[in-house]
A protein has these predicted regions:
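Juxtacatalytic substrate-recognition/specificity segment
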Residues: 149-261, 354-355
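N-terminal low-structure segments adjacent to metalloprotease catalytic domains
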Residues: 17-150
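Primarily extracytoplasmic ectodomains and periplasmic/lumenal surface modules that are beta-strand-rich
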Residues: 53-54, 166-169, 337
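Solvent-exposed, polar/charged alpha-helical surfaces in well-ordered, non-transmembrane soluble domains
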Residues: 37, 41-48, 175, 240, ...
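Acidic/His/Gly-enriched intrinsically disordered linker/tail segments
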Residues: 237, 256-381
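Short N-terminal secondary-structure initiator segments
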Residues: 81-110, 241-252, 263, 269-270, ...
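Soluble non-cytosolic domains of exported or imported proteins
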Residues: 30-41, 163-172, 233-241, 258-263, ...
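Bacterial Sec-dependent N-terminal signal peptides
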Residues: 1-22
Length: 381
C-alpha cells in the first residue's frame, strides 16, 4: 500500500501545542512558488481566524461574506474531540487545489485525527480562493454552485431557488410579524434546498461526522441587519412554510434569542404559529386533554420541572403552552408592547424571579397566585 507522508505548515502555537496545516506531497500547488506560498499562508490565516467571530475573519471574501459565514460556523471547534478529550485532536489537511478562472482556486480541506494506526475523518470542506494582491480571500462555493438558479425579490428579501417557488409563502416570510417586531428594514437572503445533504454540498461541506444519519436542517446567520438562511428541510420550492419557525427567525433579526426568556419566546411561537404543523388551537386542545385534564397539576412546579405532551410524533412543552396563554392575556391588555416587555426579561434563570416580577407588573399575578391564575386562563381559553 502506498503511504503519503504530508508536508506540515505550522500556523498557530497554542501553549505547547501547534495547530498544523498538513499538505499532501502529491498535491498540485500553483507552479509559481510565490503564489503557492501566498495561497498556503492565506489559508492558514483563514483557518486560524475561523475560530473567532465571523466578522473578524479578514480572509473572507467581502462580496460573499454572508454565504461564507454559513459555512464558517461549521469550522467552530472543529479540532476538538470530546471522545478523546483532546482540544486539538483533528488537524487540517489541504487535500486538493484545482485552478479555476481569473486566478481563483478550488480547495478541499479535511480534518483528520490519528488514534494509533487509525485515521479518523471529522469533516471535509470546499472553499474558493480568490486572489487579492499578495494574498487570497476565501468564500463558500454557494454563490458559484447556485449561479444558474432563479431569484425572487419581495421587499428586502431575496430568495434563491432552482426550479419553482411558492411566492405567497415567500411574501409571508418577508412581512409577517414586521409591524410588531419593527423588522421591516431587515434584509433576508434565503437559499431554498431540497434537504440537508444537498444544502451541505452547495455550501461546501462535503462531509461532517456530526451530521451522520441526518437529512434535514436549517442554517442561519445574522450579521449587520441581514439574516441569511439555508433551508435544507424539504424546501426546494419553499412549500413547507412554518409560522412557528418564522416567529423565531424574525425575532432574531431584532434581538438575539439568547437575550430573551426562552419559554416566553416559545410561547409566542406557539400562539402565533402553532408547532410541528399543528395550529395553536390544535396544540391547545391536545394540552388540555393530556396535561390540564389532571386537576392536581401545579403550574408553578411545572415551571421548574417541565412536562411534555404529544401531537402526532412530536413532543411539546406544557410550560410553553402556559406561556402562550400568558402572552395572549398580556397582548389583550397591553398590546404587543406588553409582550415585548415580557420577552425582554433576559435569559431564563433558576427560580424564574424576573419572570414572576414582570408577570406581576403586567398582569398583577404574584408568585403565590400563579397556579390559580393559570387554571383560570386555561378554563377561559
Amino acid at each position: 500500500m502506498k503511504r503519503f507522508y504530508p508536508l506540515i505548515f505550522s500556523f498557530l502555537a497554542l501553549g505547547a501545542q501547534a495547530r498544523e496545516l498538513q499538505i499532501n506531497p502529491g498535491i498540485r500547488l500553483p507552479k509559481d512558488s510565490l503564489e503557492a506560498s501566498h495561497l498556503i499562508q492565506s489559508l492558514a490565516g483563514f483557518l486560524e481566524a475561523s475560530q473567532s467571530e465571523n466578522s473578524a475573519n479578514t480572509y473572507v471574501l467581502p462580496a460573499e461574506k454572508f454565504e461564507t459565514y454559513l459555512l464558517l460556523d461549521e469550522f467552530k471547534g472543529i479540532e476538538a474531540s470530546s471522545s478523546f478529550k483532546d482540544e486539538h485532536f483533528y488537524q487540517p489537511q489541504l487535500c486538493n487545489v484545482a485552478p479555476l478562472e481569473e486566478g481563483q482556486y478550488w480547495l478541499q480541506i479535511s480534518y483528520f485525527g490519528l488514534k494509533g494506526d487509525a485515521s479518523i475523518l471529522r469533516a471535509s470542506f470546499d472553499l474558493i480562493a480568490h486572489p487579492d494582491k499578495d494574498q487570497f480571500k476565501f468564500a463558500s462555493p454557494l454563490k458559484r454552485n447556485t449561479r444558474h438558479w432563479k431569484e425572487y425579490k419581495v421587499g428586502k428579501s431575496h430568495f434563491f431557488y432552482q426550479d419553482s417557488l411558492n411566492e405567497a409563502h415567500a411574501y409571508q416570510l418577508s412581512t409577517r410579524f414586521d409591524d410588531n417586531l419593527k423588522s421591516e428594514n431587515k434584509a433576508n437572503i434565503v437559499y431554498c434546498c431540497e434537504n440537508l445533504i444537498a444544502m451541505e454540498r452547495l455550501l461546501g461541506l462535503t462531509y461532517k461526522i456530526d451530521y451522520n444519519g441526518y437529512n434535514s436542517s436549517v442554517w442561519t446567520v445574522n450579521e449587520a441587519g441581514t439574516k441569511i438562511m439555508a433551508l435544507g428541510n424539504d424546501n426546494a420550492s419553499f412549500e413547507n412554510f412554518d409560522p412557528h419557525d418564522l416567529w423565531h427567525a424574525r425575532l432574531s433579526m431584532v434581538i438575539s434569542r439568547r437575550a430573551v426568556d426562552h419559554s416566553v419566546d416559545e410561547g409566542c411561537a406557539y400562539l402565533y404559529g402553532g408547532s410541528w404543523g399543528y395550529t395553536w388551537d390544535e396544540i391547545l386542545k391536545a394540552f388540555k386533554e393530556q396535561v390540564a385534564s389532571d386537576s392536581g397539576m401545579n403550574w408553578h412546579e411545572l415551571k421548574e420541572k417541565p412536562q411534555y405532551f404529544q401531537t402526532g410524533e412530536h413532543r411539546n412543552s406544557a410550560d410553553y403552552v402556559v406561556c402562550a396563554l400568558l402572552v395572549q392575556e398580556i397582548e389583550a391588555k397591553h398590546g404587543f408592547e406588553g409582550v415585548w416587555e415580557f420577552l425582554n426579561i433576559g435569559p431564563r434563570e433558576k427560580g424564574n424571579a424576573k419572570f414572576y416580577q414582570k408577570l406581576e407588573s403586567l398582569l398583577g399575578i404574584s408568585v403565590e397566585e400563579y397556579n390559580a391564575k393559570v387554571w383560570e386562563l386555561i378554563e377561559n381559553s
